[in-house]
Amino acid sequence: MSEVSKISTLLAPEKFVKLSVSDKFKWKAPSRVCSIVQSDTISMTANGRSLFTFDVLKDVLKHAEEYTYVDVLGVVLSGQWLLPKGTPGSAEIILLDSRLKGKASVLAVFNCRAATQEFQFLISPGYSLTCADALKKPFEISCNVIDLPVKDGFTPLSVEIACLVQFSNCVITRSLTMKLKENPATRTFSAEEVDELLGSMTTLRSIEGLRKKKEPNDVVQGHLSAEYDVKRSVKRTKSENTPGKRRVNVDSVSLGLGKGKSVSAKNEDTESVFDDGILDSDS
């Protein structure tokens, strides 16, 4: 698979934001603001399935107060297996929008083999939500390990999430066709395959049970990595030109050692499963 790329490169706003003719004549105030938000590193341990909330607005609350809508332009999931190359087993990582019920809440399912050591995915959710809804922290990540020969108490995997969000006072029509130039071995699955990978509704019922038990500290914080104003062009704000070193907190996420057959044991080392009708993946 391809090497892991820089977040600032994958989520460069000019790849996602389409400027209108009226935008190019605006001089005084930006019509939109784009922010790259990166999570703390999540260290996975082997103690059963866990569910965490990803707070995308922690460092950009001022924009949530100034604007009406937040647009999720792109999401990058990066992972590093902390194991020898060739170790058997895999991880199932599910991204969810908890505002929705059942299968509709699944934005993407990633199955990543431990043998690959590192993985990275770029997806374009392609929809907006109100800032009021975003403040309720609807985005979640569920993790589970399958057939990994690791003892309890050790950390086999670290994961980081980053997203490009755009704030505006209107729902913007834009192009969301940008994909990774170096494709990290992805393919589109049929609805039947998605159902099989999710264990029909068993996995979703398990996640719903975790929501009821979730503690207030089960939140993966997002930190502002870069910010851009959309005027006549997409321009990085001066205050973010030379950002300081980002503080990284390590949150512990529990992962179970499942006994079921590894669903990623196919031809490709790393696979991306997209919910039918929600996301599209190009090879």
Curated annotation (Swiss-Prot):
Q: Outline the segment boundaries, as ranges, of region: Disordered.
A: 233-283
Localization annotation: Host cytoplasm, Host cytoskeleton; Host cell junction, Host plasmodesma
Q: Which GO terms describe its molecular function?
A: RNA binding
State a single Pfam family of this protein. Answer: MP
Q: Which domain of life is it from?
A: Viruses
The UniProt keywords, alphabetically, are:
Host cell junction, Host cytoplasm, Host cytoskeleton, RNA-binding, Transport, Viral movement protein
| GO-annotated biological processes | transport of virus in host, cell to cell
Chief location of this protein?
host cell
GO CC terms, sorted:
host cell cytoplasm; host cell plasmodesma; host cytoskeleton
Q: Where is the composition biased (Acidic residues)?
A: 270-283
Q: So what family is this one in?
A: Belongs to the tobamovirus movement protein family.
Protein's job: Transports viral genome to neighboring plant cells directly through plasmosdesmata, without any budding. The movement protein allows efficient cell to cell propagation, by bypassing the host cell wall barrier. Forms a ribonucleoprotein complex with viral RNA. Binds microtubules and modulates microtubule stability. Can bind double-stranded DNA.
Q: What is this protein called?
A: Movement protein
Quote the gene name from the UniProt entry: MP
